[in-house]
Amino acid sequence: MDLGIKGKVALITGGSRGLGRQSALALAHEGVDVAICGRTEKSLSSTVTEIKKLGVNSLGIIADVTESADIGSLHSEVCESLGAVDILVNNAGGSLSREDIEGTSLEDYKKTFDLNLFGGFELMKLVIPQMKENNWGRIINIASIYGREYGGNISYMSAKAALIAATKHSAISLAKDGILVNSIAPGSIEVPEGSWERFQNENSPDVVEGFISDNLPMGRFGWPEPLGDLVAFLASNRSGLITGSCIVIDGGQSISMI
């Protein structure tokens, strides 16, 4: 299937590894020029090399999405090197604590929002004007099933729920401008150096097997390729009637009916 996005420009935050890397590769397979940002030169360089082997232009930029100055510089460098951003994937995120409300400081709560919500919000504001001018744009925010139902810790759950809400509001606001805005809610997907790999390394086989038995109907952790394929589809011309949606990709893990 030709997704019709060859020659478009994508920016993926947290794109050097994990789900961001898989999203970058999936878009590159469709002929998209891809810029990624991350915090370490080594992982950025490795992923950029992989992307370029697919015959597209690629750029790796060291940036911290919790810093407004980095966000502005990131956007400017992508536009100067590859052109205006057609596809934005806000993938950078994570959890800074494992605590409930009593064990979570306000500082950690704010930092979790900086990482999971505010950085993506700033980038959306930067790319939207050119998308409106082109009457075409795609914004994909990587949330979590724990933004839809109970799970994880209070700061992460709250931030991902806010990201889903911001996605819905933005989608409706921009629907007449040719800009589609959606979120993806992954479940427990295992990637190298990711949280679920750490979970398996830090716990006994009995604990891991118990978690899988209790929570994962497929009997295994998820894998990243389906999410990358979903990102590519949502970024494409084939997704023209999909906006404001939060698409769950969790192998049946969620217990919510909606």
Describe the role of every protein-language-model region.
Residues I71, E99-I101, D108-F113, V208, ...:
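Substrate-binding pocket helix/loop in short-chain dehydrogenase/reductase
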Residues P129, I172-S173, G240:
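Alpha-helical segment proximal to the catalytic Tyr-Lys
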Residues S16-G18:
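Conserved glycine-rich cofactor-binding loop
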Residues E102-F121, W136, I140, L163, ...:
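Catalytic Tyr-X3-Lys loop
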Residues S95-R98, A232, T243-I258:
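Short C-terminal tail/terminal secondary-structure segment
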Residues A175, L180, I242-G244:
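Short, small/polar-rich loop/turn modules that mediate ligand/substrate recognition or access, typified
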Residues K176, S188-N215, S256-I258:
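A glycine/serine/threonine-rich, flexible loop-to-helix segment
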Residues I140-A162, T167-K176, S188-I189:
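Catalytic loop of short-chain dehydrogenase/reductase
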